[in-house]
Amino acid sequence: SECAKQDGTVSITPVNNGFLIKCGSLEYEVANNSSSIFRQLNDYRKVYTDKNFEGPYLKDKDGNTYKLKIGEWKVIEAGPVTASVEAECSNIAAGNIENKNIKAVIKVTGYAGKPWVNITYRIINTSDDELKIKSLVFYIKKSEDSVITEQLKPLKITAGNDSTGCGDIRTDNSHNDGPVFMTRGTTELDMLEKKADVNNIRTVVATSNYKTSFIIGKNGEEVNEVIDDKYLVKEANEHFAEVFYGTFMADYTDGEDGFSVTVHQAQQNYPKAVKSCREGVAVMLVPENVGEITMQSGMAKEQQFMIHFHSPDMKLWEIDNRSLIYQMPDRPYIAPEVFKRAGVMIDVFPVKYNDDFEISLMAKADGHSRCYGMLNWGDTVDQGYTVQGRGGGKPVWSNNEYDYPHACALMYARTGVRRFMDYLIVSAKHWMDIDVCHYSSNPLRIGGQWEHTAGHCKNGVMVCSHEWVEGLLDYYHFTGDKRGYDTAVGIGENVLKLLETPMYQVPGEANARETGWALRTLTALYIETNDNKWLVKCDWIIDNFKKWEEEYGDWLSPYTDNTAIRVGFMISIAVGSVMRYYRIFPREDIRQMILRAVDDLTE
């Protein structure tokens, strides 16, 4: 069904080999087998065509310039509050079509009664080689014949860094006639809106740490901003960056219409750049000659940005406000007692809270290492593994060992503290993109999770003891993003394949955590899907643990060529996994096996 402007609903209608989406304040079409995200967009002030939107366009450092080919759109969500459509895409290298075809997925989400859309772009290295990205840029042009380049004009004025950490450095533009102005905070915006008249084209870029720093151009003067490692290392940011660091946007406004683009968590996912000029806006998800982005074969990365269409008379502080809210949206809250009554999680809800214990848990969660960068955000370097030399002298990435997102989900459920959900979301998104193999000629890798290694997956291996799903399922439950569910199922399928390999055929030849983690993964997937296929190997693992105990007396692990020892850590993982299986299928023989294993540990 169709909806009228501003009636507070959304609709999606199949039309002309694509879809027409009406959101009340916007309506737009997407077309199958096209080269532009939008076939047409109407904000009821101006109609934009496919020629107003270009990219994202990919270039690599081997000299390839790629053409974007969008496949068939499919409906992900059809209202009443949001409308989402998604399409698989190909980035095809000109002149090298057969050998270079880099896949991508684009999703467009509109909102009831809102004049903005969210764009997610997920690139996947579906080649056998490293993909060294030279640039990845999206353009919105004011007119069909406008030309915007990715070149950045050197500015004599910059926003600078908020090194005080207070956001209180004052600016004075009362005697500045332009053509470029820099101001921090909203105090001077009314004055600068008069100096930079939208009827002569006003250009803006903005970043924030505490107060937002605006660079404003009049008469269509180019303004731009770049975020790189040098920018970040000089800026004092004391926020919980998973929740909020600051914003990063570009705005173009003339006498007819205006649009701003905000890149989500740009600082955390550097390098990034934006520019606004007389012809429109360039959004540089990877700017040229800024940093190094090398995606290994099978690696993916999703990024997102919001396009906000607004009237020429909308105040800059309102545009900034919407941009900031996009960076830190409201999160739902459910009281811990509701989680406890629902029984949807293991019982981590004490009757009486101990302040010292709670402070300790929160400190551990808040004190986790944060590693910035487009391919690093959401993961952390394991200094212990690195010092041991496991990365051959290079940093070893933990790859979310041992299901850090699940721990965050439990912390959110038991406390209701918002930032733990944001920790979950950021780390799970990294996990789904970087730590999982999306392309390989080896079927034992597809869908599986890489063990901690240098370069996230470079020279990596896959074993059952380093594949987890509970945090991904938590992410799916909290966000509704089915990619969490699909990724968890893919990991489960990989575990089933690995369990058929020789490494796992003889009880006791691998340590207890190997099949222990496999059992925990498969049990969680059975609970989620109610599909009996996950139970076949569960029963096999339980039987192996019984044979293991009978053969060795306890769950001993191979150590040296002539030694088998008790490794408490490994055994405890196995116990926890068998316990989870027992809770679903209680049997006295399993209960007694658990008790004997724990007795052996404590003795």
Regions found by a protein language model. Name each.
Residues 14-332, 337, 376-380, 396-399, ...:
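Beta-strand/loop-rich accessory regions of lumenal/periplasmic or secreted enzymes
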Residues 395-413, 461-476, 509-526, 563-582:
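Well-ordered alpha-helical segments within folded domains of soluble proteins
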